[in-house]
């Protein structure tokens, strides 16, 4: 039998739009208050995916208190209860002041990673990705005291050693990923899922389609054989790198700044090449509204033709498995065994 694809939104886990919620750990709060906050946040979040930002600025130059760790535990417990899939980001800044709010030395960041790891690992079935290195403005690894590739590598390796291998890690740019792993070769099917740092290190991008450079993600100079491993390539080079890498690890973030690169046809082409699987549902509204007010026009037989650009992108984030054909081979005279043949395509 030949089947036709539906155009409806599928409730597949670990993909789609997400909603952001942020909480500041503080000894002025009790774990019960943090639990109540998270219950409210989860209840107001219509999406299975949640970007949970945990601000550690109150502990920049001290250990995280037991009370604060208990708050984190209660928050993640509520996420489990609400059946959320959590993209987790620890940070020290929400106000563009990371240079002054980050810890004064690298060992303190490593200490914080060690402290949070047991709680995070307890909820490894709920935490999908741990984004970033705790550093930079809004945890985006920029304008940081720890932006050197050797410092970034140390933090990621600390996360790799402490955080459950069931949880993906993520860095901001392909260049950073290459510099951390000391290789220009993207992850292959042979090494995918083998438990190594290379197999779990993914990307997040909070400047998706914001400019030709995705707001600092790419550069205008082609990579050379003698380029530093963490050097940024051109847009076309980095899109190809992501196309290869992100068949096996997640890639997502938020779109920003209304411009030609996020016009619908351009957006569909580049989001597809990047294998984008998750996007912020609230930012940038100018871009999201542009998609909502545009119409996708596919081929005459395309079931999505005529839907809004937003709906097309929403239904294609991440994977979308479609059964294309099925048949049964059964000969009762010859055997009691039947063979079922199914052809499945991923149209995401």
Please give the residue ranges for each predicted region.
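Short solvent-exposed strand-capping/beta-turn motif centered on an Asx-Ser/Thr pair
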Residues: 345-348
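Catalytic-core regions of glycoside hydrolase
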Residues: 129-288
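Structural beta-strand segments of beta-rich domains
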Residues: 336-340
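Aromatic-lined substrate-binding rim segments of carbohydrate-active enzymes
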Residues: 34-93, 106-109, 163, 167
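Boundary/entry segment of secreted carbohydrate-active catalytic domains
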Residues: 1-49, 53
């Amino acid at each position: 039998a030949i089947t036709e694809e539906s155009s409806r939104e599928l409730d597949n886990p670990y993909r789609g739009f997400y909603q952001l919620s942020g909480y500041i750990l503080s000894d002025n709060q009790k774990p019960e208050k943090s639990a109540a906050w998270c219950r409210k946040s989860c209840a107001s979040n219509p999406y299975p995916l949640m970007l949970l930002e945990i601000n550690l600025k109150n502990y920049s130059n001290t250990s995280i208190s037991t009370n604060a760790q208990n708050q984190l535990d209660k928050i993640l417990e509520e996420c489990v209860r609400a059946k959320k899939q959590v993209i987790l980001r620890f940070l020290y800044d929400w106000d563009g002041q990371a240079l002054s709010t980050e810890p004064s030395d690298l060992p303190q960041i490593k200490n914080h990673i060690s402290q949070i790891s047991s709680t995070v690992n307890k909820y490894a079935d709920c935490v999908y990705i741990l984004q970033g290195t705790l550093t930079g403005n809004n945890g985006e690894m920029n304008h940081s005291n720890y932006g050197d590739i050797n410092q970034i590598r140390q933090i990621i390796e600390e996360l790799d050693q402490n955080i459950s291998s069931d949880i993906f890690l993520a860095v901001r740019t392909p260049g950073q990923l290459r510099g951390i792993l000391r290789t220009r070769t993207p992850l292959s099917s042979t090494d995918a899922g083998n438990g190594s740092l290379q197999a779990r290190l993914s990307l997040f991008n909070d400047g998706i389609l914001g400019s030709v450079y995705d707001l600092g993600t790419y550069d205008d100079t082609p990579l050379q054989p003698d380029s530093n491993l963490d050097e940024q390539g051109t847009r076309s080079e980095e899109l190809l790198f992501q196309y290869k890498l992100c068949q096996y690890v997640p890639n997502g973030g938020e779109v920003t700044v209304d411009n030609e690169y996020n016009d619908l046809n351009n957006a569909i082409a580049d989001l597809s090449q990047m294998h984008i699987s998750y996007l912020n549902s609230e930012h940038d509204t100018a871009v999201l509204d542009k998609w909502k007010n545009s119409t996708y026009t596919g081929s005459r037989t395309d079931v999505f033709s005529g839907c809004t650009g937003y709906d097309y992108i929403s239904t294609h984030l991440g994977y979308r498995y479609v059964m294309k054909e099925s048949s049964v081979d059964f000969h009762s005279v010859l055997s009691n065994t039947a063979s079922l043949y199914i052809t499945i395509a991923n149209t995401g």
